[in-house]
């Protein structure tokens, strides 16, 4: 998150220094919606993510880009999202609040030139009161409109609006545990609730008779269907909509009562 209200540490406050630049790009302080801790290195991310974040922050500060003020709802730079996969694909989404076409294009080109390894470079103009982009237009500046992850020989498409586990390596172990708990014999009807891009649904499909996935975000369901087709999986069905509206008695009468339910906790 970009913010012009940088969170000062206790050490910085006690230093009696004057801080002329309060711009920050990092993570929100718990319980302080308008304060952001400036981050130089996140140890949970690949180093390329740190390089991109630091480069974008430096460029924006040097070229006079305004950082978002959540209270006043003003400023150009809003959020930065970086996603990478185990096969080396890299997605970067820059979210602007105020739009200045010249500055926007200059920044996007700077990112593209500085980090040619980015496989999907996207941007969004989000002038809403909240940071969600699921209802916003995602514009591809350079490269593909999605990235791909691989798991047990399966390939999964991950779009900018699609949820995928942030820790790809651990996600594989999580899915293994879910599959083992399900103890599938090949004859079961499985419901995968809040299926996202259908990664778990497709992951267990080879061990089940049929898998039905339900997800609120329509674009994620499109990815789920594409993932099944790409991996030649024919025993999955996916539906987009609100769970409380879709998963009713009529739905169960049509598709059958599940033997196993996998659900997002």
Which residues does each PLM region occupy?
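SAM-dependent transferase fold signal centered on methyltransferase-like domains
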Residues: 1-139, 180-189, 253-262
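Rossmann-like S-adenosyl-L-methionine
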Residues: 102-265
């Amino acid at each position: 998150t970009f913010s012009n209200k940088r969170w000062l540490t206790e050490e910085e406050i006690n230093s009696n220094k004057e801080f002329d630049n309060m711009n920050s790009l990092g993570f929100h302080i718990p319980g302080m919606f308008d304060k952001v801790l400036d981050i130089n290195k996140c140890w949970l991310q690949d180093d390329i993510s740190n390089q991109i974040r630091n480069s974008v922050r430096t460029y924006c500060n040097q070229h006079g880009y305004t950082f978002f003020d959540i209270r006043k709802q003003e400023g150009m730079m809003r959020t930065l999202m970086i996603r990478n996969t185990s096969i080396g694909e890299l997605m970067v989404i820059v979210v602007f609040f105020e739009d200045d076409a010249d500055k926007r294009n200059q920044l996007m080109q700077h990112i593209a030139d500085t980090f040619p390894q980015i496989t999907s470079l996207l941007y969004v103009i989000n002038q809403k009161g909240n940071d969600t982009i699921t209802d916003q237009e995602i514009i591809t500046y350079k490269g593909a409109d999605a990235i791909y992850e691989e798991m047990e020989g399966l390939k999964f498409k991950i779009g900018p609006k699609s949820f995928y586990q942030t820790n790809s390596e651990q996600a594989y172990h999580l899915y293994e545990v879910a599959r083992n708990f399900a103890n599938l014999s090949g004859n079961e009807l499985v419901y995968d609730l809040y299926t996202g891009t259908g990664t778990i649904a497709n992951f267990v499909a080879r061990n089940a008779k049929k898998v039905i996935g339900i997800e609120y975000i329509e674009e994620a369901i499109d990815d789920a269907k594409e993932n099944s087709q790409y991996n030649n999986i024919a025993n999955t069905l996916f539906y987009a909509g609100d769970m409380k509206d879709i998963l009713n008695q009529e739905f169960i009468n049509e598709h059958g009562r599940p033997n196993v339910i996998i659900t997002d906790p």
